[in-house]
């Protein structure tokens, strides 16, 4: 059981805290694991990372002197794509400020914490003209479904 939870923790930690520009060394990873209640050594880290790689997680290993450094590789969206989506959401007038903030929060969760800071550094939805209707997504969905129903009906 400890191995499974350590693997899940390791995958989540690498996803949230590493990217192409921010790696973590084996020793740093051991310290993080131990600080979170997991027993770890070089072999367990190596084995766990290999298991994640075998499970199709894109964990990249780089040589950092005599030690290894690890970081999460490809993600669902690349940083420029996330920037474009965040800009589109924040500048959209029909999305309320509250809904914009919630959507931007969801989009930033797809990036590392460093990339998330970059995404939110210039986003200010409060000063923009936004819709007051928080139910716009529900209304849009209902209209879309109605249009689709009309297309299916003879």
What do these predicted ranges mean?
Residues 78-154:
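Bulky hydrophobic/aromatic content
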């Amino acid at each position: 059981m400890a191995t499974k939870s350590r693997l899940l923790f390791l995958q989540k930690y690498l996803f949230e805290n590493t990217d192409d520009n921010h790696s973590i060394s084996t020793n740093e990873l051991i310290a993080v694991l131990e600080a979170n209640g997991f027993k770890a050594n070089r072999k367990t880290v190596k084995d766990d990372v290999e298991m994640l790689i075998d499970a199709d997680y894109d964990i990249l290993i780089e040589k950092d002197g005599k030690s290894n450094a690890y970081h999460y590789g490809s993600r669902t969206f690349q940083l420029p794509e996330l920037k474009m989506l965040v800009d589109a959401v924040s500048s959209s007038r029909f999305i309320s400020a509250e809904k914009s903030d919630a959507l931007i929060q969801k989009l930033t969760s797809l990036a590392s914490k460093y990339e998330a800071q970059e995404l939110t550094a210039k986003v200010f939805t409060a000063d923009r003209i936004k819709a007051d209707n928080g139910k716009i997504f529900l209304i849009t969905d209902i209209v879309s479904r109605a249009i689709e129903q009309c297309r299916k009906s003879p």
